[in-house]
Amino acid sequence: MGNTVERPIEAVAWMERSLENSVSTVYIDDMKIIGGDWNGMMICWSREGDILWETNLGDRVAGIRLSTDGAMLWCIAGREAIGIDYENGTIKWNIEFDGSTDLIELDGENRAWIVSSVYDIELNDFMESAISLIDSGDIVEKYILDERPWSIHPFEEGKAFFGLGRPKTGVLELTEKKGKLMHKHNSIHDSPVLCGSHLPPFYLGHSNGMITKIDEKGNIMNLELNKKHGSAIIDISSNNEQILICLENKQIICLNKDGEEENSLEVLDSEGHPEFLDIIDGSTSDGLVNFWIVTSTNNGSLLINANRKNESSNIKLKIKANSRIRDIANAKGMTVVGLDDGRIIAIEEKMLTRRIRENEKSDEEGDVQRFEMLERLRKLRE
């Protein structure tokens, strides 16, 4: 892995703000940073760190999406879906569901798909789930199922795919026709879906290490991997060039779009257990494909910055936090991290790259000095 820089998260923070309770979700775009906590408080800052507004949604904020026109934030919190004015934080509408709201993705300009579920504490299992298509404050239609959907993949307006858990597993396809949701179940294999990527073509990770692909035409297929990985895929992320998967056995594997493994990293026991991945949006200042690996440790978490160079993956930086990282998001050269202790840390990519290079230069100078000293000692012994 080469020389790896280690820093406390406070040392690389461009900005630090805080919520009263544990952070449950973070959001960032080219103008604003938003954080939501487990008690429903949501605060919006400018990217310079000035507070713009705050509002209370009453329960754990689980997801934030910005409408395509940039006017409305679509949020889920507790048992509700909520519409919030992007400029001032005013609540415009809300819809209450029978169970907790788990997932949200937009459907065109003024609608969204919502996954909600009812959990039985005594049985320690999900009793029932619902997929709802909403139009602002109204439910257009609802589809009830026994399985818990673990991912939403909007295909076109009025049509989306959902990765299913047990008992049915596979991929559910819902299409709106004349105000009704038509359903089609695609049985891939009996391994439940655990996660899914967010950009088309979509990739779904299964508990047996297999990947399902939904291409740009809506075709569903098993991605033919050139190597089999029996470990569960706990997170998956993709961009235009590659797919990154995080396995339960602590391997991080990079695949090309044909399913061929290009390289891999292994998270060491001392680095904790990997929880999720995040590919850094857009081109970075060093011209490399950069990504974050978030792990949980005995005394907090690690935020690991890695990149791909010359067909190999390398860990460049380990950022230590004494609190668990709950969520991460990035946009336009800035990464935002939400911590269990309520802090929200913003990391500016250019500043971070500069510090890594300064450290590498310092290490190189130190290596030269050590070599020269050893040479002088050797000559003295001659």
Question: What positions do the PLM features span?
Answer:
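Beta-strand-rich domains and repeat architectures in extracellular enzymes and scaffolds
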Residues: 14-41, 56-62
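Residue position within the beta-strands of beta-propeller blades
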Residues: 35, 75, 114-116, 161-163, ...
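Short loop/turn segments that connect beta-strands within beta-propeller blades
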Residues: 46-50, 85-89, 134-138, 175-179, ...
